[in-house]
Curated annotation (Swiss-Prot):
Annotated catalytic residues: D51, E123
Major localization listed first in the record, in broad terms: cytoplasm
Role of this protein: Digests double-stranded RNA. Involved in the processing of primary rRNA transcript to yield the immediate precursors to the large and small rRNAs (23S and 16S). Processes some mRNAs, and tRNAs when they are encoded in the rRNA operon. Processes pre-crRNA and tracrRNA of type II CRISPR loci if present in the organism.
Gene: rnc
Compartments in which it is found: Cytoplasm
DRBM domain ranges (all copies): 160-229
UniProt-recorded name of the protein: Ribonuclease 3
Catalysis performed (reactions): Endonucleolytic cleavage to 5'-phosphomonoester
SUPFAM superfamilies noted in UniProt: dsRNA-binding domain-like, RNase III domain-like
InterPro entries, sorted: dsRBD_dom, RNase_III, RNase_III_dom, RNase_III_sf
Domain of life: Bacteria
Pfam family, one: Ribonucleas_3_3
One GO process term, biological-process aspect: tRNA processing
EC number: 3.1.26.3
Length: 230
């Protein structure tokens, strides 16, 4: 934890008062499960809080930045900015991936590189920062880390995989595309959806996500990857 404290202080001018919050933010459920007897806390609740404050701050930014954009346009752009892949990228940019505590099995299976885990970690850190320093500290951190990328327009070029897949399949003729929810697991604040894409009655691909929409996008992305190999 000492190295993480030094990283936050030197890179982002952040010094936590409650180090327990910081440690919890960087503790994955797999680690907590392996240390149940020690009553170790994990970061899912902080992730829930961080997701909410991130949505609020990015919404405020977009509302002020784009006075002529419609609600629908701003919602799309916000979704691009806070999508799992983006948040995982910011975790890596901040070197957070080096400090998360994972269970042995999760570590061996490549969890430290997994977008889902790193995206959740970024949100959990925001939740911990909110509780320790307040919302203005979260705003300052996001202005330093995320907003410059938004200003460059990097997120406006993110692909809508569902639209790309539909356009690709339409070039092959008349096709019927159906997105079907296979499973829905986890508590209300940490859902995990699995979705399949059925094309003309046959399963083309599957995807995972924290919402139906994210799972559909993941399934479409996987389908495009498969089709590019054919």
């Amino acid at each position: 934890m000492k190295q993480l404290e030094e990283l936050l202080s030197t890179s982002f001018d952040i010094q936590f008062n409650d180090l327990t919050l910081l440690e919890t933010a960087f503790t994955h459920t797999s680690y907590a499960n392996e240390h149940r007897l020690l009553n170790v806390s994990h970061n899912e609740r902080l992730e829930f809080l961080g997701d909410a404050v991130l949505q609020l701050i990015i919404s405020e930014y977009l509302f002020a930045k784009y006075p002529k954009k419609t609600e629908g346009d701003m919602s799309k752009l916000r979704s691009m900015i806070v999508r799992e892949e983006s948040l995982a990228g910011f975790s890596r940019f901040c070197s957070f991936d080096a400090y998360i505590k994972l269970g042995k099995g999760e570590e061996k299976s490549g969890g430290r590189r997994r977008d889902t885990i790193l995206g959740d970690l970024f949100e959990a850190f925001l939740g911990a920062l909110l509780l320790d320093k307040g919302i203005d500290a979260v705003r300052r951190f996001l202005k330093q880390v995320m907003i410059p990328q938004v200003e460059k327009g990097n997120f406006e070029r993110v692909r809508d995989y569902k639209t790309c897949l539909q356009e690709f399949l339409q070039t092959k003729g008349d096709v019927a595309i159906d997105y079907q929810v296979i499973s829905e697991k986890g508590p209300a604040h940490a859902k995990q959806f699995e979705v399949s894409i059925v094309v003309n009655g046959a399963v083309l691909s599957k995807g995972l996500g924290k919402s139906k929409k994210l799972a559909e996008q993941d399934a479409a992305k996987n389908a495009l990857a498969q089709l590019s190999e054919v």
